[in-house]
Amino acid sequence: MSKERVAIILAAGVSSRMNTKLPKVLHEVCGRAMLAYVLDACRQAGVGSLYVVIGYGAEQVKKQFEGSKDITWVDQPEQKGTAHAVLCCKKHLKDFDGETLVLCGDGPLIRVATLKTLMEKHKTERSAATLATAVLDDPSGYGRIVRDTYGNIQGIVEHRECTKEQLAIKEVNPSYYLFNNKILFDFASKVKPDNVKKEYYLTDALSIMIAAGHKVTAVTAVLPEEAISINSRVQLSETGKIMQRRIQLELMNKGVTIVDPPNTWIDARAQIGQDTVIEPFTCIHGEVKIGRGCRIGPLAYLRSGTILKNGSYIKPGTVISQENMDESVRKGKKNVS
């Protein structure tokens, strides 16, 4: 394998708190599977090949992303922890002499800028491993970053393994790592399941690296919202609100007027032209294309497949689908089909 940068994305887990039959990473955030955001962030950050570790609902996940030629699917039949998931990729990457990004498929709020900062830090520090950290007001549930008196990272302690003093630490591990590939697999194989859950933690590999004298650095580059991993319907809803804000902010910066952002919902796949005005209580769902200088709503619902030409006017209360699109735009009548 040529020297490049690859990513291992952990997407095999089952979340009992989601109470769902659908694989967790296929739950949608603003119209897209949460895993899709992670894949795109890796691509935009310059990652060449993606190794996605799957387990529960593996065939469903593969079908959702069929046609993505940069993805190699890696099976993890039993979920024995993050280090075990990484080791499932060893047969594909054992001869790779580059950098391996490791992150989770249930963290769709990761930004490309954060991944690039992580990569730059890894390069300038010439580290064996680099992790991005976040500082949270409420660090409950997250692994804590333990540093010495000089600020050097000593390790990561999972929440349930923390002492009372460690629980007070607010710097946490959102699970974004960059490793020198051969060191990653060497030390992941040394991890033992010496914890409450009897799992193989990738965080333990970092502690073993440090004890062996390898340089491990951490960069506080993660916004608090990026640290959210979705493990419940409540977190799914919270993540959707944050993603919706990002979608609308990007559109407004491109010249779209959104009169009342909190009362407007726009799908991540929608395309909206400059100088279009979106009135309150409008929902734009699915792959919708809206031209320049349009006015939509209020109280309009545009279904997937809708295409509006430049200057279109959608009257209040209009429901548009691909089937009634021409009539709705021409007459501005209310449609309920």
Name each region found by the language model:
Residues 69, 110-196:
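Conserved core of the sugar-phosphate nucleotidyltransferase
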Residues 2-6, 32-103, 109-113, 117-120, ...:
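Conserved N-terminal catalytic core of the sugar/cofactor nucleotidyltransferase
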Residues 257-337:
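Structural signal for interior beta-strand "rungs" in well-ordered beta-sheet cores
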Residues 25, 70-72, 152, 215-217, ...:
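Conserved beta-strand segments of alpha/beta enzyme cores
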Residues 21-37:
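Short catalytic helix/loop segments, enriched in acidic residues and glycine
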Residues 5, 49, 90, 187-188, ...:
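Catalytic cores of nucleotide-enabled group-transfer and carboxylate-activating enzymes in metabolic
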Residues 1-20:
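N-terminal nucleotide-binding beta1-loop-alpha1 segment
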Residues 154-244, 249:
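Catalytic-core segments of class I nucleotidyltransferases/pyrophosphorylases
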